[in-house]
């Protein structure tokens, strides 16, 4: 008779051990050493000692939770948010902003094997100009409105949020009261808030038709609060109830966008990021510049104010059309937008026949591994790579370095203070 055996699972004892943290990773976890390997402990800071319980024991690392903290680091802060520790939005409100930035910069420097000399940051509070709040109305219970718990689909009822733009934070109680008064509360999915240059937007997702009375109540609310209201009965449909088409400012230009289009959450960092990209590229009046993954023109249009000509390339047709409209709206006639599959060889396109002096790219988290060889063929003098994923940035950078480019500037973008998100910007120059 055959017998089957399963591999023994590594058993973690609930033994309490005392450790001292010597580092902070980019996600805000304290890092100690135990039994010759890294031990990650959420909630602890460098120079803090604690009694901890091992919760996961792997071959290369382990995880633990704090049983009792024995001392406090001078870098420890009192979290401003009453929901901190339960809400999944922020992970580092207990960490001084200086330590947050140092730990993120150190993680970036290790990955890129290059010193981080620039930190681009804005105010650490009230910076989020966009947020999505989940909605749920269980039978015979009040409406829930808030963010998801860490590692859970449960909703944390948010009464206040100190990282939201003040205009949005002030609206939360009134939005909750308005939505709770509707007859169709059980059909509400989520509400998105955006603080645009044109004013405040509210986008309400609902899963069944709203009654005429509910629509009228929402419209009255939008007028009384002076906000633009959009209803989203289906994922691809957007119904304008009140207000004007939104826009935001990028380097002194006005960019129109659809309420569901991606815009950078942190306005102050976005403005500095665009300005720094123009500075690093050293855009001159005779330059031809290529902007890959250009969206609706956040970088493209400011580049066009300085260069002889700019080409923006994007994989989403609606954003290409929006970019063209924004160029016309801002009186820029030296910029063209194209919809292309960026995995294909862009150097074979007619618009690339004269080459480019400078290239900027701002890809999604997956990076731009399929694009790097095409950029190399263009032989630009300078390349600025804006990244929201340091791992794919490090991978893509190798291709440029192997082709004779050198990292000459590296910046950490503190786009999301109090979270583990790490964004960055690199200047490569051809040697």
From Swiss-Prot:
Q: Where do the annotations place S-adenosyl-L-methionine binding?
A: 264, 293, 298, 314, 341, 362
Q: Name one GO biological process term.
A: rRNA base methylation
**One protein family per Pfam:** TRAM
Instruction: Detail which positions bind [4Fe-4S] cluster.
Output: 81, 87, 90, 161
Q: What is its EC number?
A: 2.1.1.190
Show where the TRAM domain sits: 10-68
Q: Do the record's keywords include Metal-binding?
A: yes
Positions annotated as active site in the UniProt record: 388
Q: Which InterPro entries match?
A: 23S_rRNA_MeTrfase_RlmD, MeTrfase_TrmA_AS, MeTrfase_TrmA_CS, NA-bd_OB-fold, SAM-dependent_MTases_sf, TRAM_dom, U5_MeTrfase_fam
The free-text function statement in the UniProt record for this protein reads: Catalyzes the formation of 5-methyl-uridine at position 1939 (m5U1939) in 23S rRNA.
Protein's name according to its UniProt entry: 23S rRNA (uracil(1939)-C(5))-methyltransferase RlmD
Organism from which the protein derives = Salmonella choleraesuis (strain SC-B67)
Gene coding for it: rlmD
């Amino acid at each position: 008779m055959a017998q089957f055996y399963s591999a023994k699972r590594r058993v973690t004892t609930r033994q309490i051990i005392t450790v001292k943290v010597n580092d902070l990773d980019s996600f805000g976890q304290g890092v100690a050493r135990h039994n010759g390997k890294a031990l990650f402990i959420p909630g602890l800071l460098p120079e803090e000692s604690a009694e901890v319980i091992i919760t996961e024991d792997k071959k290369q690392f382990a995880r633990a939770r704090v049983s009792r903290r024995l001392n406090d680091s001078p870098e420890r802060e009192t979290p401003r948010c009453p929901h901190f520790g339960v809400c999944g939005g922020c992970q580092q409100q207990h960490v001084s902003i200086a330590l947050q930035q140092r730990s993120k910069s150190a993680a970036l420097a290790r990955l890129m094997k290059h010193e981080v000399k620039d930190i681009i940051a804005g105010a650490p509070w009230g910076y989020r100009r966009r947020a999505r709040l989940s909605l749920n109305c269980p039978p015979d219970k009040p409406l829930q409105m808030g963010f998801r718990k860490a590692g859970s689909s449960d909703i944390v009822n948010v009464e206040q949020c100190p990282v939201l733009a003040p205009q949005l934070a002030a609206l939360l109680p009134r939005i909750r009261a308005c939505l709770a008064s509707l007859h169709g509360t059980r059909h509400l999915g989520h509400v998105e808030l955006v603080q645009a240059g044109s004013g405040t937007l509210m986008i309400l997702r609902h899963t069944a038709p709203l009654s005429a009375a509910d629509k009228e109540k929402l419209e009255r609310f939008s007028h009384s609060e002076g906000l633009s209201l959009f209803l989203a009965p289906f994922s691809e449909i957007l119904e304008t109830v009140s207000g004007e088409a939104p826009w935001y400012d990028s380097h002194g230009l006005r960019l129109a966008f659809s309420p569901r289009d991606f815009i950078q959450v942190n306005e102050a960092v976005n403005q500095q990021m665009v300005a720094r990209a123009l500075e690093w590229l050293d855009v001159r009046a005779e330059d031809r510049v290529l902007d890959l993954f250009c969206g609706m023109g956040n970088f493209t249009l400011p580049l066009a104010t300085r260069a002889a000509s700019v080409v923006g390339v994007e994989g989403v047709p609606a954003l290409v059309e929006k970019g063209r409209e924004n160029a016309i709206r801002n009186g820029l006639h030296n910029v063209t937008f194209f919809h292309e599959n960026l995995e294909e060889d862009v150097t074979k396109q007619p618009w690339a026949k004269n080459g480019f002096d400078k290239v900027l790219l701002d890809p999604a988290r997956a990076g731009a591994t399929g694009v790097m060889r095409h950029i190399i063929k263009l032989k630009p003098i300078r390349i600025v790579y804006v990244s929201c994923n340091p791992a794919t940035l490090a991978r893509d950078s190798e291709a440029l370095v192997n082709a004779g480019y050198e990292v000459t500037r590296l910046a950490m973008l503190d786009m999301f203070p109090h979270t583990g998100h790490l964004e960055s910007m690199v200047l490569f120059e051809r040697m």
